[in-house]
């Protein structure tokens, strides 16, 4: 499925049509390269602090992106990703961490029920999963690389929302953001070995569409219910001019 594209004052971002149905209670977006102030090689909408770009430029990029999404930049909570399975419950005490205060945690997944507390996760090649529980108004954002997926970060995030907020997986909605696709993702043996261990030995011989379906079911751990999951596929390489999805 394609991503609806939005533009405002030169800033371009993508959304999930599924999550947009809940736009009155939750805001979301997948950033692109367009619409920021960073100079090469970070041009232009670089949202990654501490990577050599001007801190002032990064803050201005956040001001623009958060403004487009109508969320408070000063309360954004940034993940500190290490390709592991830690899920952090974010509270008002975490507001601004990563931009205006140091991150005293490592976590590849963030969850919250706080209002006006934007959750920010980052991706190069990896997938991003956004979760929303419309019953309890709880949200989650997950950096879902192959290591994390194989280790169960997606299941752990869903379970953490169930344990913490009372979320029912059948009522949750989820969307996976743009990432590198199989056309461009060459791996060593460690990736197929890890994913075969997670998905089952027969996964190596499944047709692509069936494997995609099983990956979705495995990744989300969501039963078909009122919510359900929606996979949004977009390989970063063909759209590399717009989306930062490959590491240098």
Positions of PLM-derived features:
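Active-site microenvironment for binding and transforming phosphate-containing groups
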Residues: 1-248
């Amino acid at each position: 499925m394609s991503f609806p594209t939005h533009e405002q004052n030169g800033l371009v971002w993508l959304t999930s049509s599924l999550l947009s149905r809940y736009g009155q209670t939750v805001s979301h977006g997948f950033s692109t390269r367009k619409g920021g102030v960073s100079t090469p090689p970070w041009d232009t909408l670089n949202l990654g602090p501490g990577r050599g770009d001007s801190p002032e430029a990064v803050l201005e990029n956040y001001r623009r992106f958060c403004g487009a999404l109508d969320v408070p930049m000063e309360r954004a909570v940034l993940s500190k990703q290490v390709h592991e399975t830690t899920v952090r419950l974010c509270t008002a005490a975490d507001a601004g961490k990563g931009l205006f205060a140091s991150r005293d945690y490592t976590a590849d997944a963030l969850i919250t029920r706080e209002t006006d507390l934007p959750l920010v996760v980052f991706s190069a090649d990896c997938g991003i999963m956004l979760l929303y529980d419309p019953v309890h108004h709880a949200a989650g954002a997950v950096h879902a690389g192959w290591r994390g997926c194989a280790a169960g970060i997606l299941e752990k995030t869903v379970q953490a929302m169930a344990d913490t907020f009372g979320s029912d997986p059948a009522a949750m909605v989820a969307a996976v953001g743009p990432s590198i696709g199989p056309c461009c993702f060459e791996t060593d043996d460690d990736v197929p070995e890890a994913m075969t261990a997670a998905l089952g030995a027969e996964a190596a011989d499944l047709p692509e569409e069936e494997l995609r379906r099983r990956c979705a079911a495995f990744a989300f751990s969501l039963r078909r219910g009122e919510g359900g999951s929606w996979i949004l596929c977009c390989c970063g390489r063909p759209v590399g001019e717009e989306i930062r999805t490959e590491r240098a």
